[in-house]
Every structure is written in C-alpha cells, then in structure tokens.
C-alpha cells in the first residue's frame, strides 16, 4: 500500500518529467516576454484558451525544432511543467491539434512583429544588442506542397504557370544549394523568403520581413533598413550583406541617410569593364582619367555599375 501511495505522489510531481535546465530556460524566457499589449481572451464569445499561452506554446515549438503541430501537442502532454510555464491550466485538458491549427491560421502577423519590436527595444536598453554592425540575408521557406517533394519527378512541377493548389499565395523562387563560392548549384522551389536583419555582434535578429519567393533580396533591403531605423536608429552603422545586395542604391542610401558603410562582395554579373583611354588608363565615373601609376583596385564596385 505504501508503494502505491509513493508511486501516486511521483506521478503528481510534474517536475520529475522535465529536465531542470529546460524548465529553467522556459521559466526565465516567458518571465521576460512582454505580451501585455496582446488581449489574453476575446471580449465577446467563448473564452477559450489564453492567447498568451498559445503564443508561448508556438515559441516552445520553434525552440524545440518541431515542424509539426502534433509534435508540439505530444511534447506539452509529456512535459506538463512546460505547459504550466506557457500559461495553461494543467488541471484541465490541454489544447488539441485542431485548436493550435486554428489559432495559427487566424493569428495576425502584425502581433508577432510587435512582440519582436518590443523585445529588441528591451535588449537594446539592456545593452545586449545594438545596430553598429548589422547584416541582412534571406532564407527560403518552402510551401507545404507536393511540388517541393524531391521524390516528385513531374517535368512541369516548377513551371511558373503550374501554381500549387495547396497554397495559392506561394510563388516560384530559386536559391543556392551550395555554400561553396566556386560551385554554381541552384534549386527551384515554391514558397516564400524570410529576410532577417541581425546584429552581427550578438547574432540576434533585429527585424524580419517575409515575402513571396520571387522577390529579389535587394528590392526589400532599403525598406527593411528604413523600418528598423524607425524604432531602432542605425546611424553610423556598418552594413554587411552578400553579393545579392550589390546594388548602387543600397550603397548610396546607407551612406547618405544613415552615414554608414557597406561591406558587400562584388557581383560580377552587374559590372562592366571600365572604359580605357588609348594609353590604357581607365576612366572613372566622373569622366576623369586615372593617373598612369594609380592603384586601380580602389575603384568602388558601385561606381562600375551600368
């Protein structure tokens, strides 16, 4: 009888089913997450689950690297302490798969953007992030469609007119399939792009924008910088990016609007050979010839554009 009672007490202690470092991480994370501007419950209709708890649950999903909502549901049921830290009443049933799915579909992305902005301002105030050295890049986000399945051998799956039925908003894009600079390997995909501006010192994101996959990186760079500058000044910054951002407008605006500098590799596809005088001297953008013994390597990539 004592053994049965002992086993029951063990089952009641939810702390025994979650490692203490993980529990401490989520406890600290959610204590420092400001969701005060998000209504916790709807003003009318059924009360349902707390919006704050649902948001925290999806943060757990990303931190744990889950790609499926079903994995999140299983994790919360097996780690009730984490569910408690999210804000759920663990004495009652937790949200089902369909509750999470419906919340995600109806959730306004503007709320996430405001949460991120609030956290960035808090981290800046604490001296954890700053904008003196920033970098911008994009990453592909594949749509959940069979046309992205590598096992699909349909010849027309990446034709622009063959829009996936499962996702009418996604678009056809291309991304590099290798990190080697001397290897030109590309892959097509249906989906989106996530453009992220980061603090290169701390490695933490400062701003993000999601677009459809066909949008070129350089076309949204200035919008991202302007949006960031509106709440977190980027004056006197050093802007780091890859050759996809080697565009004259970016050099000019970073210099003129933010008094910053760009570190961007030369995109050879956007350059041309400089005009030469009969003596062989290159002519600069201001139509003046370089001296015979000048170091021609100082020519800015931006000045060699069409």
Residue ranges, per PLM feature:
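Polybasic low-complexity intrinsically disordered regions
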Residues: 97-259, 263-267
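Short, positively charged, Gly/Tyr-enriched micro-motifs
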Residues: 47-115, 225
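Outer-membrane beta-barrel domain signature
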Residues: 46-47, 183
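Short secondary-structure boundary/hinge segments and terminal tails
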Residues: 79, 141, 272-273
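Short, Lys/Arg-enriched N-terminal segment that forms or immediately precedes the first helix
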Residues: 32-46
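Glycine- and acidic
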Residues: 39-41, 53, 58, 207
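Helix-centered, glycine/charged polyanion-binding patches within enzymatic domains
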Residues: 249-306
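Charged, often Cys/His-bearing segments associated with DNA-binding zinc-finger transcription factors
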Residues: 1-33
């Amino acid at each position: 009888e004592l053994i049965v009672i002992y086993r029951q007490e063990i089952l009641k202690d939810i702390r025994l089913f979650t490692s203490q470092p993980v529990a401490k991480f989520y406890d600290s994370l959610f204590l420092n997450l400001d969701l005060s501007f998000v209504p916790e419950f709807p003003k009318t209709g059924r009360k349902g689950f707390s919006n704050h708890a649902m948001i925290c649950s999806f943060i757990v999903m990303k931190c744990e690297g889950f790609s499926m909502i079903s994995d999140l549901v299983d994790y919360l049921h097996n780690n009730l302490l984490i569910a408690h830290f999210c804000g759920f009443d663990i004495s009652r049933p937790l949200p089902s798969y369909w509750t999470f799915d419906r919340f995600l579909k109806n959730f306004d992305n503007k709320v996430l953007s405001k949460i991120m902005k609030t956290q960035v301002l808090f981290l800046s105030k604490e001296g954890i992030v700053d904008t003196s050295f920033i970098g911008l890049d994009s990453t592909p986000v594949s749509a959940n469609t069979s046309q992205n399945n590598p096992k699909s051998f349909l010849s027309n799956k990446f034709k622009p007119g063959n829009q996936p039925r499962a996702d009418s908003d996604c678009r056809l894009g291309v991304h590099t399939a290798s990190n080697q600079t001397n290897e030109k390997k590309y892959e097509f995909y249906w989906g989106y792009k996530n453009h992220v501006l980061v603090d290169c010192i701390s490695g933490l994101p400062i701003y993000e924008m999601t677009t459809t996959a066909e949008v070129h990186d350089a076309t949204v760079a200035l919008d991202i910088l302007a949006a960031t500058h509106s709440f977190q000044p980027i004056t006197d910054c050093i802007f780091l990016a890859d050759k996809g951002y080697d565009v004259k407008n970016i050099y000019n605006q970073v210099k003129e609007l933010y008094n910053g500098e760009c570190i961007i590799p030369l995109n050879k596809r956007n350059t041309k050979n400089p005009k030469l005088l009969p003596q062989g001297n290159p002519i600069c953008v201001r139509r003046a010839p370089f001296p015979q013994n000048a170091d021609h390597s100082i020519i800015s990539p931006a000045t060699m554009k069409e």
